[in-house]
From Swiss-Prot:
GO terms for biological process: lipoprotein localization to outer membrane; lipoprotein transport. It comes from the Bacteria. This is Outer-membrane lipoprotein carrier protein. The keyword Repeat does not apply. The lineage of its organism: Bacteria, Pseudomonadati, Pseudomonadota, Gammaproteobacteria, Pseudomonadales. HAMAP family: LolA. It is found in: Periplasm. Participates in the translocation of lipoproteins from the inner membrane to the outer membrane. Only forms a complex with a lipoprotein if the residue after the N-terminal Cys is not an aspartate (The Asp acts as a targeting signal to indicate that the lipoprotein should stay in the inner membrane).
Amino acid sequence: MRAIRMLLVSALTLGSVTAYAGEQDVQRLTQLLEKSQTIEANFSQLTLGADGTSLQETSGKMTVKRPGLFYWHTDAPQEQVVVSDGKNVTLWDPDLEQATIKKLDVRLNQTPALLLSGDVSKISQSFDIASKEQGEVMDFTLKPKTKDTLFDSLRVSFRKGLINDMQLIDSVGQRTNILFNGVKANQAVPDSKFKFDIPKGADVIKE
């Protein structure tokens, strides 16, 4: 009986420690994300199949601004521009001369870019969060709490308090790694940066 009681006490104690650690992880991640009201950076993106085969490699520049504004420009030869004005997202494909416009999904588990530019005050409602610190690098692993999501796992890494890289893993094991460099935080960025003017004569698709 005493052994059972000891196990119960241990389990309760461990449960309390885990919950506390989880709350700390949420607070640390929220503080790091909210610390940067604007971010400008270059990025390189690599997508790997479940077997490790390279599927796509791109690079470009991005700018984000809270709340909900972002601009991602992927360079040629696979050039595309994705812009959010906080209400709608416009995807511009210059090769097709086509713009696709859809309403911004403000759910963090549907639009990962909003981790860097959206409202993260309730991030724990969408994800279970764990952290790991190694020197000047802080890693956070986010697991969606629902199945209605674009990815199974998301890792966000910070170096010296600034975003360093992100990794998304989807349901079939495909991994997308995004490395940021030349990161500048809290610079003055006008809202006009997030207004995309569709070229005349382009095809426009509204979803």
